[in-house]
Structure formats: structure tokens, C-alpha cells
Amino acid sequence: MAYYRTPHDVTALPAWQALQKHRDAMQSFSMREAFAADAKRFDQFSLSACGLFLDYSKNLITEQSRDLLVSLANEVGLQDAIKSMFSGEIINASEGRPVLHTALRRPVGDKLSVNGVNVMPEVHKVLNQITELVGRIHDGLWRGYSEKPITDVVNIGIGGSFLGPELVSEALLPYAQRGVRCHYLANIDGSEFHELSANLRAETTLFIVSSKSFNTLETLKNAMAARTWYLAQGGSEAELYRHFIAVSSNKAAAVAFGIREENIFPMWDWVGGRYSLWSAIGLPIALAIGTANFKELLSGAYTMDQHFQTAPFDKNMPVLLALLGVWYGNFWDANSHAILPYDHYLRNITKHLQQLDMESNGKSVLQDGTPVKTDTGPVIWGGVGCNGQHAYHQLLHQGTQLIPADFIVPVVSFNPVADHHQWLYANCLSQSQALMLGKTREEAEAELRAKGLNEADIEKLAPHKVIPGNRPSNTLVVERISPRRLGALVAMYEHKVFVQSVIWGINAFDQWGVELGKELGKGVYQRLVGSLEDSAEDGSTQGLINYFRGRHRG
């Protein structure tokens, strides 16, 4: 039986038990001493793949650690799980679906059957439709109701219909095509729509409504607000089709909204929202950077798919990162993981990875519904590196929690200013170095003596200047952010998340926890507006409803 039908008890596996013993033996392991003792440690714990360079030498591991972690991957049947995903088996068991976002980046000529049907012709048909539409808009052939070319495109979507496309279009801003500006509208908060629409003209604005079901509350409310605004600005119902297109699997609902069927791009149930930027959900990406660059993005992801499927686990970038995450989360009691990009254009990668990781692996039952016996997904947090140094890096250095971190940095800047980028790169490296080295009591005292402090003051101040060190991190270096390398980077994290789900025996591709809040939200709304008089299920919620109703105006 496949792993997703008969989930294992990972804690009973020999490799897991060996790792527990190894963890005890590693209690006094010092990275500082390991580097001093082994001049080749950097070479032994680093690798290149798909335009990315990974240094994972600043981790609490030895070669034995890596071997044991790889053994764990083998014992859970990771290779078979990878094959199952790429071949279209139903690995999303709770929803009865295959998981094939990887099909979206496979080249022309590949074959892949879902329910006996080769899906690749349809995938490339949609990609060709994207290419045609983007070309018409960039060439000024798609015109609004006043016959003026489109200048602004607003993507209306939330979750995976927003976070991935926003990340990519902003990360690749240096590749932006002239003439068309792309914007994103996700939050149901009216202030977001107000601020965005204030800078738009209806006659030259195109809205993309991105919702698989065409029933997502926030997206539909924003789409209706956009429609009302469009009509108030001088647009007409008859010309609505010029200003609204959709990405959805619910054609009937999109047509009822006023969108022409030929302007509805399909979605497939074998592509989850947080994995959908490679699909027609990526239409705003293609509009922002052009279809040639969008296809380069897909190609970069495809190269990582190939690496993931073929590289030995001890030289497999997504697998190694996943195993390190399991090592810290399950054996070192780490509850969170920091993502620290040292690049302005990558500032939104943490938000995307939060959804990718936490929505995928925030699970407490195995594939068969029985409780897990281990901790699963960590909290993902972080932000732009240099800014974080003056905010939360203090917790990384001297806090009581062990928090592994990923540093992401390019070698070349798109916008060099004097020696700014050299300082940026130096800051990135020095932060990972400081986490690893720390500062001993002796070093702190010597530093204070060199400044002329007396012994009494040194005795008081030195403990505050001690930094434990031995804090783990990975450093991911790219020569320069490009569509191809970014595609590989995002795909790498996708595969990392999948590997961890296989080890824990959970389903990374459903999100039932998200649904409960949606269901309860309907009842809360009805009570807020007075259409439902029954009390809420609990006193706290009812009290907050009463507070709102007693004070709300408008």
C-alpha cells in the first residue's frame, strides 16, 4: 500500500530511534570547534543545484548526523513518495486528488495521465492562451471601453491566488515590461480597495478575478466593489467584458458575473492554491514580466523538479533542508524557522513561504486520521535581513529558543549604489557567522578590558555581552535573482515541505482548518447585521458581537 494510505509511526523506525541517541551524543557539539578541527567542513556541507548555492555547514550536524537523517528518508519511503507525486497518484487522500503542480512546468511533448487522460496538451494550451492575452495587452490591442489601451492590471485574489504571484512579480521587478502596471487586491478591508482605486482610471484598468470556485468571500466582495467602481467611473455593463477576466474552474459563475467565456482561464483540482503560481493564477506574473520570462520561471522550477527526483538524498537540496528542519523540530525542540532574505525584491518571500509551509504542514493527524506522535510544521517568520538585524535578530542571538534560519542573498545587485551591496552581503554573512560563533565570557571580558573598564564593572557587564552561539543557519546564495533561479528557489521550498510531510505521515495538500473559520464567519456576520437573532455558540463571541452592534455606524 502507498504511504498515504498506510501512514507509518515514524517514531518507531530504527533511524528515528538512532537519531534520538545521536541527539544525546550531540549535546556538547560545538560548531566553532568543528570548523576549527576540519578545514573541509564547508566543502563537505555545501552544494550547488539549479543556479542556487547552499551552505549548510553552520548546522548542528556531523557526517553521521547527515547519514542518519538520510536513513530516515529512506525508511519512510521518500523515493516512492516522490515518484507517486510526479506520476499523478492520489496522494491528497482526504480530498481524493493527485498533486500535480509540477505538471505545469513540464516541457512540451511530455505525457502525464490523470484518470486516463493526458493532461499535458491542456496545460500547454492554457500557457499559449496566456501568451496570446499578454501579447495583446502589451501591444495595446486590448482596449477598454473608451478605446484606450490597458495601463493597469489588478489581480483580485487571496491566499495562493495572491501571495505567490505577488512574490514573483515583485521579486522580478527589474524584468518588468513597460506600459502595464500590476497591482494586487486581496484583503476584504475596504481601505485596501480605497487606496488602490484612488490611483486608477476605470477606462484603462483590467481586473483579473482569481478564484477556483468563484465563490471565495473576500475575492467576490472585492470583485463586486471593483465592478461598482467601474460602473460609477463611466463604464457600462455592455463593455464590462473589456475590463474583467477570470481564472476559475466555475465558468458558470464567472459568466453570470459578466465575464465572457473565452476570457475565463481554467484551474484544475490537482493544483492547490498555494502551489498555483505556475498556472493561469500566474497570469499577473506574465503580464508583469512578459511571457518569455514567465516561461523561464517555469523552466527554473522544472530544473529543480529534475534535481529533486534524481539527486541522491545526501546531495539533494530540498531533501537536505527538509531533513534539517525535522532534525531541529523533532530532536532539538525548535518551534519556528526564520526566513531572512537579504534582497529588497525578495521582501515578500517570507509571506509566501508562511502559507506554503504552515498551511501545508500545520496538521495534527496522519493520513488515516489518527493523531500524530511528533510535532509537525513550524511557525515560519522573518523578513528583509538588514531591517531584521535592528529588530528581532536579538532574539535569534541571545534568546532562550533555538530558531534555525535561512539566509537568502544574491551576489549581484540590480541597482548598485556605491558599496551598499558589499555591505549588504557582508551583513548577511556576519549574521550567520555571529549566530554560529557567539561570544564567550572570556571574549566579553577581554573586550571590556580593552576598553579600559575596571574589574568590578566588567564583572557586572560581561554576562550581558555573552552570546551563546551554536545557533544553526543555512545560507542560500544566488548569483543574481532571475526568473529561472527564482523558479528553482520557490520549487525547492515546495519540495522541502513535501518531504517533511512524508516523514511525518501527514497530508500537505489539504487545509481543513481554514474551512472552519469560513463556516463560522457566516453566522457571525448574520448576527452582526441582525439577520440572525440566536446567540453565538459562546459568550465571548456574542459579547464581541454586542460590542460591535452597540457602536458601529455605517
UniProtKB/Swiss-Prot annotation:
Record InterPro entries: G6P_Isomerase, G6P_Isomerase_C, Phosphoglucose_isomerase_CS, SIS_dom_sf, SIS_PGI_1, SIS_PGI_2
Matches recorded under SUPFAM superfamilies: SIS domain (SSF53697)
Catalytic activity of the protein: alpha-D-glucose 6-phosphate = beta-D-fructose 6-phosphate
Pathway the protein acts in: Carbohydrate biosynthesis; gluconeogenesis; Carbohydrate degradation; glycolysis; D-glyceraldehyde 3-phosphate and glycerone phosphate from D-glucose: step 2/4
EC id: 5.3.1.9
Any Pfam family the entry gives: PGI
One Gene Ontology term from the biological process aspect of the record: glycolytic process
Enzyme class, broadest EC rank: isomerase
Gene Ontology, cellular component aspect: cytosol
Coiled-coil stretches: none
CDD domains linked to this entry: SIS_PGI_1, SIS_PGI_2
Main location: cytoplasm
Record key words, sorted: Cytoplasm, Gluconeogenesis, Glycolysis, Isomerase
Keyword hit for Cell inner membrane: no
Active site: E359, H390, K518
Keyword Cell membrane: no
Localization annotation: Cytoplasm
Function of the molecule: Catalyzes the reversible isomerization of glucose-6-phosphate to fructose-6-phosphate.
Protein family (similarity comment): Belongs to the GPI family.
HAMAP family: G6P_isomerase
Database matches in PANTHER family: GLUCOSE-6-PHOSPHATE ISOMERASE (PTHR11469:SF1)
Protein name per the record: Glucose-6-phosphate isomerase
Record organism: Pseudomonas putida (strain ATCC 700007 / DSM 6899 / JCM 31910 / BCRC 17059 / LMG 24140 / F1)
